[in-house]
Curated annotation (Swiss-Prot):
Belongs to the TIC214 family. It is found in: Plastid, Chloroplast inner membrane. This is Protein TIC 214. GO terms for cellular component: chloroplast inner membrane. Involved in protein precursor import into chloroplasts. May be part of an intermediate translocation complex acting as a protein-conducting channel at the inner envelope. It is a multi-pass membrane protein. Part of the Tic complex. GO terms for biological process: protein transport. Keywords: Chloroplast, Membrane, Plastid, Plastid inner membrane, Protein transport, Transmembrane, Transmembrane helix, Transport. Its main location: plastid. The chain crosses the membrane at residues 18-38, 67-87, 127-147, 175-195, 218-238.
Length: 1705
């Protein structure tokens, strides 16, 4: 067995070595490249198939040789770099392909082009064989058509970098390719043999002999191949950008002219005189010195000469094919803030990796400047390697360590000396290291210091932020942040250091150049001195000075698109701005104007200046985009475009095209089966019935598609709009003045000839009623007389109001019916087509016009129908007369019989009639026998028939009389009749049919009676049930009223004794009873037992708390578990301990060092870096929140179930407003339940890091104030730390995302004046306790809730939005499903939150923030259980009023103010969007109709009359016709929905870099001056970067905690340097073991020990506060980021991947 296993192991290892060897892998990849088929295979197959004979054999050999040679060259180019560059560059392929295609074209076009007469065999002069060789060789190099992605061929290139012996790999891959090629050619040969032997194919070839002859003809094949190759190469050349037809970038001088158009238009128009004066000043200063002017002219000439000379110096190849030349890039990025603009360059990568010296070692930097690296390479080429001295890395590192130690010792000594001075000397600010400022040495005046913005000795926050303004001379005070003193005006630095990039200065200089005003140098010098010697008390108005310096021509230009060019042209026409040529392409658009200001309207106005009139009365219109795919995609005009070679377009218009390699990443895979399913459902819909709405939608879609087809037809024809416009105009004139008058004349002449009265007046009256309106391209009404702007080029429409239709006659008004009058008054309109026909809408199909002869034919048909109807009536009357005669005769006979006294039955049933007939037949048989025997002998011969019938009649009469007598006897004597039935069989047989008739009749009556009784019973049951239901509802309602009254009485009683009761924050008894009632009902319906999943955890612990004695052994396994807590928290066990249920000793204790990674632990203390799980997962490839020693504890899966039931639900005992726990699932409360659950789960996860959180209590303090710890003393400042707002609302931070387990949102509860709290046995309703927290929001106090309803109505939200007032509304109405105004949870924080999503301090997230000065953290509540306010506390206040609502009359004013605030929110730079609801099509149609009518009304004189007619016809919608649309009403009605536009979250390396390095952009509230120091009382215990507003620290009392932070002694720069030097030489002192599985290098040192939040923090808070201020301020991360202290996985030099941001040494 051992031998077998040994042999087997050796065999497996041998096989693995063989498989992994370079030769086998090369053979495999070479074999795969065989399937990369290109055009060269076509030449090879042609030579093998079509060529025959000796010459054919030579051509086969030459084709195979050329093919293999070309492939060999391709394989060699993989290894040999120059050959790879030659064959890989696009210009080389272009140079090779174009001449060869030309040569090949001439070879195939002329037959004797290569024929040199008779040649010997094996002669090299036979150029046709050489041509075959070149074809296969060159087209093997140009293998680019069939598989453009060339994925199989690139596998060889990829694997070559992974092996060491590259030449062996290339050789083996070439051999593998030859093997695959041989097999492929053998397969092709077998395929040809099979085709020749197949009979069906042979029959087809024989039937098409001419086709075979054509294929055999060499010229036709050569022509086919030449065409095919031409198409192939054109397709290939279309993939590369055109290097010839492109445009140069505009020069810098031209681009500077564009910047003047960014100025304010109104200022430019209104301040002409002032600007002219400024221009004089500018010229006076700039051109006072003529030397500057000469210098500029010489510099410009020198630039032009350098450019021209530089063009000829370049090599020809680089001049034509250099992709880094003057050509424009492909894309141009526009930023939202309009400050960061620029185009995208190919060579500008996101990261640039290069080696540099960092920490004394060679490290890879990913942000190395590319220009510096190229400069270093250029220097290295110039300087020989022998002159450079190489220093070993060890020497560099030791030198670096030595210098750092010296620096550290010096700083330590200085720091120690300053601290000793503090201990001996009084506290003085002189001991603190002051900031070094640049000032005049002679005068030590503070005012002579240079402004902080330009002070080179200041950096960071002290220099402030530079804001780029339109005016360079005005320095805004707000741009210099954290400046306590106001700097006086100093204009010297403004002249020496002007504000850069000033469009105002450039504008004034350019104007002065245009006017060419010359002012001598003396005046200029005088003006300069006056500007320097200024009075500080003067107004801050400066003249713009051109900056001294040179602007580099790198991305200094500014590009505009076609839309901007169009508007600038319009402004130029209006005398406002100048037009420019566009450089960016946009979608095709048309400006649709419905109101223009012409000279005619100017004459009617009160303006005297036409330009002024055009400025204040601009044309009104909007931009309409054509509905077609936009493939230009904002591409720069005349740029080199590269087609996407790997892109596959599935449909005619695809929004996000990409390679098929990434189809698996798509959520909706575009598999053809989806199209088949759609086809199946469409067929099913066609076969079935459709509703009216579907039919209308389909008709609308068909109309829209037809309209788009017609528009596309006119757009594609050259000069179509001009010809169409002229034809429309001609058709309107022809219709108006020629066609219709001729028709009227012809009609009236015909009426005269037919001896009828003519209708000249009526016809011409209808003709004059017709109105022709000129409309724009989309059909918007423009004017009756004026044409739209550019109507000949852009096209226009002609709309006809009340179109004239010729009628054969007119009825008089007296004869008009109501229907005719209504039809006459109806408004009708249509559009004129090019053919003179009418259509309902622009570019629509022609409609059917009423025919002239149709009324005549209708009249004739009507008369004919009347005659037919009269004839039918006459025939019917004749038939009725005949029937009436018969009926009269029948009645007459019946009356005669009645007069005789005979009873004649009018109605005889069928059964009785049949029974009588049978009896008659029997009687007739018997009687016939008797009569035949008796009378046959005595009757005479002539009277035989008559006597026989007479005898029969007599016999029947006698028989009837006997039966009637018997019936009467039976009625009298019933008993005798029954005895006779038993005895006499004959009588029994006669009585049975009569009894059956009676029974049958009785059964029918009984069935009918039973059915009627059943109906009556059902009716009575329904009536009884209705009474019972009404009674039940009445009883329930009265019961609720009584319960409510009892609850109110109980709450009034408990207001007195509320301090004596222990409040337990569980669910109320009413909720429990209601839930159990629902459970019992569900149990009755489903007949199942109770399950544990129906009970929530709160209910279980409620029952546990209510029991007096608990068998502790049953709960020991749960309550005494020492491992990680799965679902029970410490405060639950603390509560049971206080209740006396079990001891504290059995509580599970928190294990030491079970915290999280200290790096993450510290980052979580700073809200800027408290990222979500998904964000961290992209940076750190590990699970979130590992346990100790990299052990992931088992996690309760119920925490991650979003829509799971309330099973094992965590609850927050320390919350002030109780969470309702619904035991059964409810759709209306699904969002509320999930939101609370997510909030609690977030706190549960964060409870380890926050010692003052809701769900945390230290395990080392078991018996500390147990009697007063029934509620937690909340630290309101920490709430934003527990539930931080971070990043911004993106796809990775939405609460509805299933993967998101890290909650980010604030749980809001709006406290009203009545607050409901759940207690043990009853509901407690009580007023607010005026115990305001540290932060609270004021609102006007009133007893009614109407003002709050006004607030929510204004916001477009229901009153119980997000459940904030659900406790108030429980007593008034049932909870409805709320419609949310905004998708995220918070609205008030939204505008602040969007400004700087990750750098806003927590306390600034509140607006109108008030600080209660009487608030103290250490409030001791002994016997009185008061309630703290919520963090978001809408509490009554008398100092400030959020809404100034004094009476009902002020409501309107407050609403207007609130609407203005909402408009500011919308108009601001916030990513909000307005979304239409489902009524989009209807509202759009109404809006378009109103716009058409508005455009017509504005251009008319008599507006009132026509507008009233429009309103009467209900064509103008008055609901939409408002001057200012009320946004709140639109949102309240559901027409508009405001929701945030989700910003795209680009979680890449650049995003995290900016987050870390951008901490220097701290909010201005954190900028504190050096003279002030922090108050530890004002800082949250676990949130050290929080700062307090300055007015909070004015009236503070001096306490022991107001100690100076030692680090503040040094300056920020020295302090930073000391921290970094200390961190370099720290030892590994981490208590928690960390497994370095991210890095493979073992020599990387660990970072310094972070502040571990352990029990020492609770004992020595003040010391740790100081230490934390010392070691980890906010600048710590900035220092490490600026020093490029990051770590990369650099084991493999060919791949660079930033696994995570790693801090070391």
């Amino acid at each position: 067995m051992i031998l077998k296993s040994f042999l087997l192991g050796n065999l497996v290892s041998l096989c693995m070595k063989i498989i992994n060897s370079v030769v086998v892998v090369g053979l495999y990849y070479g074999f795969l490249t065989t399937f990369s088929i290109g055009p060269s295979y076509l030449f090879l197959l042609r030579a093998h198939v079509m060529e025959e004979g000796e010459e054919g054999a030579e051509k086969k050999v030459s084709a195979t040789t050329g093919f293999i040679t070309g492939q060999l060259i391709m394989f060699i180019s993989i290894y040999y770099a120059p050959l790879h560059l030659a064959l890989g560059r696009p210009h080389t392929i272009t140079v090779l392909a174009l001449p060869y295609l030309l040569f090949h074209f001439f070879c195939n076009s002329k037959k004797n082009f290569l024929d040199y007469g008779s040649t010997t065999r094996n002669s090299m002069r036979n150029l046709s064989i050489q041509c075959v060789f070149l074809n296969n060789l060159i087209f093997q190099l140009l293998n680019h058509f069939i598989l453009p992605s060339s994925m199989l061929a690139r596998l060889v290139n990829i694997f070559m970098f992974r092996c060491n012996s590259k030449m062996l790999f290339v050789t083996s891959s070439f051999v593998g390719w030859i093997i695959g090629h041989i097999l492929f050619m053998k397969w092709v040969g077998l395929l040809l043999v099979w085709i020749r032997q197949n009979r069906s194919i042979r029959k087809y070839i024989q039937a098409n002999k001419y086709l075979v002859l054509e294929l055999k003809n060499s010229m036709s094949m050569a022509g086919i191949f030449s065409i095919f190759l031409l198409v192939t190469c054109v397709h290939y050349l279309g993939r590369i950008p055109s290097p010839i037809f492109s445009t140069k970038l505009n020069m810098l001088e031209k681009m500077e002219e564009e910047e003047e158009f960014d100025n304010n238009e109104e200022e430019e128009f209104d301040n002409n005189e002032e600007e002219e004066f400024d221009n004089n000043k500018t010229v006076d200063y700039m051109y006072g010195n003529q030397e500057n002017l000469k210098f500029k002219i010489l510099e410009k000439k020198q630039k032009d000469e350098e450019k021209n000379f530089f063009l000829f110096e370049k090599p020809i190849l680089t001049f034509f094919f250099d992709y880094n030349r003057w050509n424009r890039p492909l894309r141009y990025i526009r930023k939202i803030n309009k400050k960061l603009k620029g185009s995208v360059r190919k060579e500008a990568s996101q990261y640039f990796f290069y080696t540099c010296q960092s920490d004394g070692k060679q490290r890879i930097s990913f942000t190395y400047p590319p220009s510096l690296s190229t400069f270093g390479e250029m220097i290295a080429r110039r300087i020989s390697l022998s002159t450079l001295e190489k220093i070993s890395p060890d020497e560099l590192y030791t030198e670096w360590v030595f210098t750092n130690k010296e620096k550290k010792n010096n700083l330590n000594n200085e720091f120690i000396n300053r601290i000793e001075a503090l201990e001996t000397v009084f506290l003085s600010l002189n001991i603190l290291e002051a900031k070094t400022r640049l000032s005049n040495a002679e005068t030590k005046n503070k005012n002579n210091c240079l402004v902080k913005m330009y002070d080179p000795f200041l950096n960071g926050m002290y220099r402030g932020r530079m804001k780029k303004l339109f005016s360079s001379s005005i320095i805004n005070e707000t741009s210099i942040e954290n400046c306590t003193e106001t700097a006086e005006l100093n204009k010297i630095h403004d002249i020496l250091l002007p504000y850069p990039n000033s469009p105002e200065n450039e504008q004034k200089i350019e104007r002065s150049e245009k006017k060419k005003r010359k002012i001598d140098s003396n005046n200029g010098l005088k003006f300069s001195l006056n500007e320097i010697l200024t009075n500080p008390k003067r107004e801050k108005k400066y003249i713009g000075i051109n900056e001294i310096g040179k602007k580099p021509p790198r991305w200094s230009y500014k590009l505009i698109n076609e839309l901007e060019q169009y508007f600038k042209k319009r402004r130029k026409e209006q005398g406002i701005m100048q037009g420019l040529d566009h450089q960016l392409r946009t979608r095709k658009f048309k400006h649709i104007a419905f109101l223009t200001r012409s000279e005619r309207s100017f004459k009617k106005s009160h303006f005297k200046n036409y330009n002024l009139y055009r400025k204040f009365n601009r044309d009104s219109g909007f931009i309409s985009y054509l509905e077609e795919p936009d493939f230009r995609r904002a591409v720069i005009k005349d740029s080199m475009r590269v087609q996407r070679r790997k892109m596959v377009i599935w449909g005619p218009s695809q929004g996000n095209p990409h390679s098929p390699l990434f189809l698996e990443k798509m959520e909706d895979f575009p598999f053809p089966i989806s199209d088949l399913m759609k086809l199946f459902f469409n067929i099913r819909d066609w076969l079935g019935k459709k509703s009216e709405f579907e039919i209308l939608d389909q008709q609308f879609q068909i109309k829209k598609n037809n309209q788009e087809d017609v528009i596309e037809f006119w757009e594609n024809i050259p000069y179509a709009q001009k010809s169409r416009s002229v034809l429309l105009l001609a058709q309107s004139i022809f219709r108006r003045y020629i066609k219709l008058p001729l028709l009227i004349i012809a009609k009236n002449i015909g009426r005269i000839l037919l001896r009828q009265s003519p209708e000249w007046y009526e016809d011409f009256q209808d003709w004059n009623r017709e109105i022709y309106l000129k409309c724009n391209y989309n059909g918007l009404q423009f004017s009756k007389t004026e044409f739209p702007k550019n109507w000949l080029i852009e096209g226009f429409q002609i709309k006809i109001l009340y179109p004239f239709h010729l009628k054969p006659w007119h009825r008089s008004k007296l004869r008009l019916s109501d229907r005719d009058r209504k039809q006459q008054d109806d408004f009708d309109s249509c559009f004129l087509t090019v053919l003179g026909m009418e259509t309902e809408y622009p570019f629509g199909p022609p409609r059917k016009t009423p025919s002239f002869f149709e009324p005549i034919f209708k009249d004739i048909d009507y008369k004919v129908e009347i005659r037919k109807f009269n004839f039918r009536i006459r025939r019917a009357l004749k038939k009725i007369k005949k029937k009436e005669a018969k009926v009269f005769f029948f009645v007459k006979q019946i009356l005669k019989e009645l007069l005789k006294g005979k009873k004649i039955p009018l109605f005889i049933t069928r059964e009785i009639y049949e029974s009588n007939e049978t009896e008659r037949e029997k009687d007739s048989i018997i009687s016939n026998k008797i009569i035949h025997e008796s009378l046959s002998q005595n009757r005479p011969k002539g009277l035989t028939n008559y006597s026989q019938t007479e005898e029969e009649m007599k016999h029947r009469i006698d028989r009837r009389n006997t039966i009637r007598n018997q019936i009467e006897i039976m009625k009298k004597n019933k008993k005798t009749v029954t005895l006779k039935k038993k005895i006499n069989k004959k009588n029994n047989g006669e009585a049975l049919p009569t009894i059956w008739k009676i029974l049958k009749r009785n059964n029918i009556e009984l069935i009918v009676k039973i059915f009627i009784e059943k109906i009556y019973i059902d009716i009575f049951l329904c009536i009884i049930n209705m009474r019972r239901i009404a009674l039940q509802l009445f009883m329930e309602s009265t019961k609720k009223i009584i319960e409510k009254y009892i609850d109110n009485n109980e709450t009034n009683k408990e207001k007195i004794n509320k301090t004596k009761q222990n409040q337990i924050d569980f669910i109320s008894t009413r909720t429990i009873k209601k839930a159990f009632d629902n459970l019992r009902n569900s149990k009755r319906k489903s007949n199942i037992f109770f399950e544990l999943s129906y009970l929530s955890q709160k209910y279980v612990f409620l029952k546990l708390s209510q029991t007096q004695v608990i068998h502790f052994n049953k709960l020991r396994s749960i309550l005494q578990y020492n491992g990680p807590s799965f679902f029970l928290k410490n405060e639950i066990k603390d509560f049971f301990g206080r209740q006396g249920i079990f001891d504290y000793e059995v509580r599970h204790k928190k294990l030491p060092n079970s915290g999280m990674n200290p790096w993450k632990n510290w980052l979580r203390g700073h809200y800027q870096y408290d990222l979500s799980q998904i964000t961290w997962s992209r940076l750190v490839p590990q699970k979130w929140r590992n346990g100790k020693n990299q052990c992931q504890p088992s996690q309760n899966k119920d925490l991650n179930k979003w829509y799971s039931y309330e099973k094992d639900q965590l609850f927050d005992y320390k919350k002030k407003q109780n969470l309702k726990v619904y035991l059964l699932s409810n759709k209306e409360e699904n969002f509320q339940k999930n939101y609370r659950y997510d909030r609690l789960s977030y706190k549960y996860i964060h409870s380890e890091t926050n010692k003052k959180s809701y769900i945390y209590r230290s395990s080392l303090e078991p018996n500390k104030k147990q009697e007063n710890s029934t509620r937690n003393k909340e630290k309101t400042v920490n709430i934003l730390k527990n539930i931080p707002i971070k990043n911004y609302l993106g796809k990775s931070d939405i609460i509805y995302m299933e993967k998101n387990t890290d909650r980010k949102y604030l749980g809001w509860k709006l406290n009203t004046n009545i607050q409901v709290e759940s207690n043990k046995d009853q509901i407690q309703i009580r007023d607010k306790i005026p115990n305001n927290g540290l932060f609270y929001l004021p609102i006007y106090s009133n007893s009614e809730i109407n003002y709050k309803r006004v607030f929510f109505d204004w916001m477009g939200m229901p009153f119980d939005w997000m459940g904030m007032n659900e406790k108030f509304l429980i007593l008034n109405r049932p909870i409805s499903n709320p419609k949310f105004f905004l998708f995220p949870e918070f609205l008030i924080l939204y505008h602040k939150y969007k400004e700087k999503p990750w750098f806003i301090p927590s306390n600034l997230l509140l607006f109108n923030l008030n600080i209660n000065p009487n608030f103290s953290e250490n409030q001791n509540i002994k016997g009185k259980h008061e309630e703290d306010e919520d963090f978001f506390n809408f509490s009554p206040s008398n100092s400030k009023q959020y809404f100034e609502l004094k009476n009902q009359n002020n409501i309107e004013e407050s609403l207007l103010e609130s609407i203005e605030k909402l408009q500011i929110l919308i108009k601001g730079d916030f990513p909000l969007q307005l979304r239409w609801t489902g009524r989009l099509n209807q509202l759009n149609q109404k809006m378009m109709n109103n716009i058409q009518i508005y455009g017509l009304l504005v251009s008319l004189i008599n507006v009132r009359k026509i507008s009233i007619s429009y309103i009467q016809r209900k064509e103008m919608n008055l609901d939409i016709m408002r001057r200012r649309l009320n946004l709140t009403q639109l949102t309240k009605k559901g027409i508009l929905i405001m929701e945030p536009a989700r910003l795209s979250v680009k979680n890449d390396g650049q995003f995290f870099m900016y987050q870390i390095i951008g901490i220097s952009l701290v909010h201005k509230s954190k900028h504190q001056s050096n003279q002030r120091y922090r108050n530890p009382q004002n800082v949250a215990k676990n949130h050290f970067d929080e700062s307090i507003p300055r007015h909070k620290t004015l009236n503070r009392d001096k306490k022991n905690s107001d100690l100076l932070v030692p680090e503040k002694i040094l300056s920020s720069r020295r302090r930073r340097e000391l921290r970094i030097l200390i961190s370099f030489n720290l030892k590994n002192q981490n208590n928690v073991h960390r497994k370095k599985f991210f890095c493979k290098e073992n020599k990387i040192k660990n970072w310094s020990q972070f502040l571990d939040e352990s029990e020492n923090f609770d004992r020595k808070k003040n010391e740790l506060i100081k230490l934390k201020f010392f070691f980890w301020p906010n600048y710590r991360l900035e220092d490490l980021a600026c020093m490029n202290r990051y770590w990369f996985d650099t084991n493999n030099g060919s791949r660079f991947s930033m696994l995570r941001i790693y801090m070391y040494p």
